[in-house]
Amino acid sequence: MNQAGVVNAGYPGDTTRELLARFDRDVAPHSPDLVILWAGVNDMLYCGHTVPPEEFRRNFRRLVHRCRIPGSAVAAGTLPPRINAYFFEQFPGAALDPVPPDERVECANAILRELSTELDFPLIDFEGLVRSRPVAEDPASLLRNFSNSGMRDGLHLTPEGCRLAAELAFEVIRREHLPSSRIVCFGDSLTYGPWLKGRGTAAEDAEPYPARLAALLRKAAAR
């Protein structure tokens, strides 16, 4: 945990199954007062490893309860869209799936909204943030694409996207009066930040959203 009390506990490829399996190793030892959960993209889209929607619901509910056992507050992020053309390039077999990727992601977001109401935790609207810019092949997109990064990615955030995601998370923490002295950002590659400077960390000069959030918290504490 860094000076601002933020841990980047993201890991690429994880579904909610893996998050449950590594909770005691990667979250519990930090005794966080807040856990930010951002997961579900791999559950819905990682071909060969997808998790059925109702299992995703059960797993996410278990994650929330697991966070709360020692008294941690919980917030969760909605899932951003992805650039479908890139997705079908990476997973050609997905084009045969009768359920389009956008519908799978929206299914997960609907479950997250329902759980937010049922279990009373705030949502961070990362989906809305990404949709506020062009989603497809555009330099202004918050998703990494060939125009803005030279990579046909279409899922992970640009450095600018991470900065704005951190600002959004910070706003929710302040608005909801959430504790913020010890935060674990727990999720998959969207939290980890592949291809970014300081990936997998919340170091002072790193680019993933947990690092940007830590910087905002340090700035607020210094006022």
Q: Where are the model-predicted features located?
A:
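Alpha-helical cap/lid subdomain in secreted, periplasmic
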Residues: 2-5, 14-183, 192, 203-223
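Acidic/polar, solvent-exposed loop segments in beta-strand-rich repeat domains
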Residues: 197-201
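Conserved S-adenosyl-L-methionine
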Residues: 187
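Conserved SAM-binding motif I beta-strand of class I
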Residues: 8
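Acidic/polar N-terminal loop/beta-strand segments that form early-domain functional surfaces
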Residues: 11
